[in-house]
A protein has these predicted regions:
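Acidic, His/Gly-rich catalytic cores of divalent-metal-dependent hydrolytic chemistry
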Residues: 92-174
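Hydrophobic, aromatic-enriched interface-forming segments
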Residues: 63-95
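Active-site neighborhood of phospho(di)ester-bond hydrolases with catalytic His/Asp-centered motifs
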Residues: 46, 76-81, 113-117
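Short, glycine/charged-enriched secondary-structure capping and boundary segments
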Residues: 2-5, 59-60, 91-94, 128-130
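Short, structured patches in soluble enzyme cores that scaffold and shape functional sites
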Residues: 47-50, 82, 145-147
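Short beta-strand scaffold segments in enzyme catalytic cores
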Residues: 37-40, 85-89, 130-134
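Active-site environment of divalent metal-dependent phosphoester hydrolases
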Residues: 1, 51-53, 78-90, 105, ...
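Active-site neighborhood of divalent metal-dependent phosphoester bond hydrolases
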Residues: 1-73
């Protein structure tokens, strides 16, 4: 719900309100109409975890990944909420695996969740933008890192009157 920021930290609430106040009603309506889940035969794309709202959460631990996998309907799922590029793999009867990765041929008969990282607000000690390139033919995923003008981005944050901690996070990558 684009009008409900009651369940977020104060810093996030400030940014949420700032952004909301700058969007036109038609833009808010369009954002509200977007699907919460994009699902194909082969993969799904979500914001946080596959757990139903409001229980969805950051997938940052094996316990949280295990909960996520209870609701994942495809072998492969991409998510972004944690802002950390990571890989979680689940095969029934085996220990759940979580790790960082750069290049990976995705295994068959295993559920895989890939955290795609972030463009801005990184949380993995690396200020560069992160994205995942998924090759459907090779069934592979590659982590891409791109430098951008962090100082200019920090200046825009501060000039907008947003919390200074948001600007410093860009340099620190946390």
């Amino acid at each position: 719900n684009l009008n409900d920021n009651s369940n977020v930290r104060e810093e996030a609430s400030t940014v949420f309100s700032w952004t909301h106040d700058r969007l036109r009603p038609d833009q808010l309506q369009w954002l509200g109409s977007l699907p919460k889940v994009i699902q194909t035969d082969n993969f799904m794309v979500i914001h946080s975890s596959c757990q139903p709202y409001p229980n969805c959460t950051y997938v940052t631990s094996a316990n949280r990944a295990a909960l996520h996998f209870l609701f994942q309907k495809t072998d492969l799922c991409f998510n972004a909420h944690s802002h950390v590029p990571l890989l979680a793999m689940h095969r029934p009867g085996h220990q759940l695996t979580m790790k960082y990765f750069h290049n990976l041929i995705l295994p068959r008969n295993v559920q895989v969740m890939i955290g795609v990282g972030a463009v801005g607000q990184p949380r993995d000690d690396d200020p560069r933008a992160a994205a995942i390139l998924y090759n459907t033919t090779a069934n592979s995923a590659t982590l891409l890192r791109v430098k951008y003008d962090v100082e200019a981005a920090k200046k825009r944050i501060l000039d907008a009157g947003l919390p200074a901690s948001l600007a410093s996070r860009l340099t620190l990558g946390k």
